[in-house]
């Protein structure tokens, strides 16, 4: 591993730790608390003011809507997949498998980080502040609350995808991943299922700390090469 890679790992870890501690150490999360409150109530009040916005937020917070995010991620990978020769196609499949394994590993780590943080809808309800629940206003079964919102698992998954795009497919792919990450993470924030900092602090710091060791060390490439050598693949010459 080169000195440049080591520097990048140290930088990513330093930013991740500093970001997390800026939220975790201050009493009541310091300046992040006022930002969280402002973001939540900005969107929450608009649920009552705009019927279109209400149903837009409701629609994007159906569990099934997560499939749309998955489909967009798959389309990006397929775009690069069909540009490759047979060997390149096999490599992209191995990159995808490695990314999936990394996501599972981070999810398992996430479960160990039990912060017991209520979503803003539940938090403000508990302290008797009026809150609009998307599920109550529409009668739809949507994601608008959580008893363990930090760190945001939805945001972490999208950030991992973006990190892999940046590492293996370049800047344009990374930009596409960032756009997806913002759009699909925002839906949970607008519904009140997550705080802004669940994603901006929790998901981001978790991915900076974990993916730097996966993608900036030989770890990911080692797994990819092992998969290329061990797995049987169809003949992609006709694709």
Predicted segment positions?
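N-terminal transmembrane-helix/juxtamembrane module of multi-pass inner/ER membrane proteins
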Residues: 2-72, 110-142, 232-239
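Membrane-water interface at transmembrane helix exits
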Residues: 40, 44, 74-78, 106-114, ...
């Amino acid at each position: 591993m080169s000195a440049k890679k080591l520097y990048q790992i140290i930088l990513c870890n330093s930013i991740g730790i500093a970001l997390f501690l800026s939220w975790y150490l201050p009493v009541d999360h310091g300046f992040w608390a006022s930002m969280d409150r402002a973001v939540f109530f900005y969107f929450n009040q608009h649920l009552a003011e705009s019927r279109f916005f209400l149903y837009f937020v409701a629609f994007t917070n159906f569990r099934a809507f997560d499939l749309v995010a998955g489909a967009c991620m798959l389309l990006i990978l397929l775009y690069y997949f069909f540009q490759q020769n047979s060997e390149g196609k096999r490599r992209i499949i191995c990159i995808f498998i490695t990314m999936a394994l990394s996501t599972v590993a981070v999810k398992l780590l996430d479960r160990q980080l039990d912060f017991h943080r209520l979503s803003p809808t539940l938090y403000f309800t508990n302290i008797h502040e009026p809150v609009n629940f998307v599920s109550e206003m529409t009668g739809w079964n949507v994601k608008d609350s959580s008893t363990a919102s930090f760190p945001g698992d939805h945001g972490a998954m999208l950030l991992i995808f973006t990190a892999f795009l940046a590492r293996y497919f370049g800047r344009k792919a990374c930009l596409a991943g960032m756009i997806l990450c913002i759009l699909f993470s925002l839906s949970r924030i607008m519904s009140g299922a997550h705080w802004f900092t669940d994603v901006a602090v929790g998901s981001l710091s978790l991915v900076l700390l974990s993916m730097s060791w996966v993608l900036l060390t030989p770890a990911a490439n080692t797994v990819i090469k092992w998969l290329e050598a061990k797995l049987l693949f169809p003949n992609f010459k006709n694709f």
